[in-house]
Amino acid sequence: MPPSVSRALLLLAGLGCLLPGFLADEAQETAVSSHEQDHPACHRIAPSLAEFALSLYREVAHESNTTNIFFSPVSIALAFAMLSLGAKGDTHTQVLEGLKFNLTETAEAQIHDGFRHLLHTVNRPDSELQLAARNALVVHENLKLQHKFLEDAKNLYQSEAFLVDFRDPEQAKTKINSHVEKGTRGKIVDLVQELDARTLLALVNYVFFKGKWEKPFEPENTKEEDFHVNATTTVRVPMMSRLGRYDLFHCSTLASTVLRMDYKGNATALFLLPDEGKLQHLEDTLTTELITKFLAKSSLRSVTVHFPKLSISGTYDLKPLLGKLGITQVFSDNADLSGITEQEPLKASQALHKAVLTIDERGTEAAGATYMEIIPMSLPDSITLDRPFLFVIYSHEIKSPLFVGKVVDPTQH
């Protein structure tokens, strides 16, 4: 790399913590005006976020069909959209089009306003759904940033900024990792393994989620059972069990059974269990239109659900993945990030994303809390998620997928 081209390190940390989880104490209380609630700008960007989520999922899935997948498309999109504030020319266009925005149909101002409203919505303190998204700019102490970029990052993306000396990579790495670890309450540690001394700027984002099942499982019903990783591999997992009223239906287009489980606070988990031998078909055929249809479909019935307790994570180098979606120039020596600073030519040298998922029985924090519902005295349907399946965690408030994933082996952390 020519010495005239400095490095900008782009870091992204997405955390999904489902039962249990923690909401950062320092989360600022941000009110949403009634005007914004009447005109949810984040809904305008929702179709693009959903398309980006599935496109990125397919790129990740193509890399390996034997590992779990878990990432936050919202986290990744937030960080790159914020980066686009300082990008110009083809660099700028590639980033936004790579996030699946049609720039002839959606004005750039609407895109950023959509993300601004999304952040206001997810960071609301009055929601039963504990959800927070945070951005930070980690700036080399001698780097002077453009005033407009700093102001836009703060006003549109609620970004805070702090200074480090990247010439001391170990100290800078410790500060960044400590920031992420603190913000995710210890769920994401050591995000940055190596740091180049030529780094001038780091963008950090994390999304934090604590979901409470609307209908929690009882721990005493959890038993060790088989999970069939593939035709030759079976592992033992703690399998949760619950009889309740759920939306359950079979989709012939996907050759899959769809289970919808709701969280308190206007969020839903869609679990897609493919028919035997149809996992690849499901991954190739799933569309945003089908997800929207599943979320709207009502097929409530008595169902015995058998679901594996799990704690999985995903760590991704986004540079090659996003390159396949057309985002290449920002990582090259031809990057134009002069809207961030004119002091030094910048490029993004690295883009990291780490996400952590925990699913267990607990639906409330209060000891002894009980959920009761009336079950008709007919023979219930049953679904056992004992082989690889896909899932989408969806926020109805922002009409976008918060997290997307695949469980291949629940014992693989």
Swiss-Prot record:
One of its GO terms (molecular function) is serine-type endopeptidase inhibitor activity. Glycans are attached at N65, N102, N230, N266. The record marks M377, S378 as: Reactive bond. Pfam families: Serpin. The keyword Cell inner membrane does not apply. Plasma. Residues 1-24 form the signal peptide. Keywords: Glycoprotein, Protease inhibitor, Secreted, Serine protease inhibitor, Signal. GO terms for cellular component: extracellular space. It comes from the Eukaryota. Its main location: secreted. Residues 368-387 are annotated as: RCL. It is found in: Secreted. The reactive center loop (RCL) extends out from the body of the protein and directs binding to the target protease. The protease cleaves the serpin at the reactive site within the RCL, establishing a covalent linkage between the carboxyl group of the serpin reactive site and the serine hydroxyl of the protease. The resulting inactive serpin-protease complex is highly stable. PANTHER family: ALPHA-1-ANTITRYPSIN, SERINE PROTEASE INHIBITOR, SERPIN. Inhibitor of serine proteases. The primary target is elastase, but also has a moderate affinity for plasmin and thrombin. Belongs to the serpin family. This is Alpha-1-antiproteinase F.
